[in-house]
UniProtKB/Swiss-Prot annotation:
The keyword RNA-binding does not apply. Keywords: Elongation factor, Protein biosynthesis. This is Elongation factor 1-beta. It comes from the Archaea. The keyword Cell inner membrane does not apply. Belongs to the EF-1-beta/EF-1-delta family. One of its GO terms (molecular function) is translation elongation factor activity. Disulfide bonds: none annotated. Promotes the exchange of GDP for GTP in EF-1-alpha/GDP, thus allowing the regeneration of EF-1-alpha/GTP that could then be used to form the ternary complex EF-1-alpha/GTP/AAtRNA. SMART domains: EF1_GNE (SM00888).
Length: 88
């Protein structure tokens, strides 16, 4: 079974949120078998900055769904969207 790299856009619920703390909470929320291979930050608007973690997950049924759900449950996250997916 191969692996998939997915860039996921995580929007915080406030421009005042501490992005370093949010990044740490996202790392701790990962389901088993998934790992983060780096973060990018994207200035959206009005001081709001999105986090863009690249997540490596096994290439099986469900794909990034478990990661999206776990990120969505993290305190301070407004929305989660997959931006890009590719096999590695």
């Amino acid at each position: 079974m191969g692996k998939v790299a997915a860039k996921i856009k995580v929007m915080p619920d406030s421009p005042d949120i501490d992005l370093d703390e949010l990044q740490e909470r996202l790392e701790q929320s990962l389901p088993e078998g998934a790992k983060i291979n780096g973060f990018e930050r994207d200035d959206v608007a009005f001081g709001l900055v999105a986090l863009l973690p690249t997540v490596i997950v096994p290439d099986d049924a469900g794909g990034t769904e478990a990661v999206e759900e776990s990120f969505g449950d993290v305190t301070g996250v407004e929305s989660v969207a997959v931006e890009n997916v590719g096999r590695i």
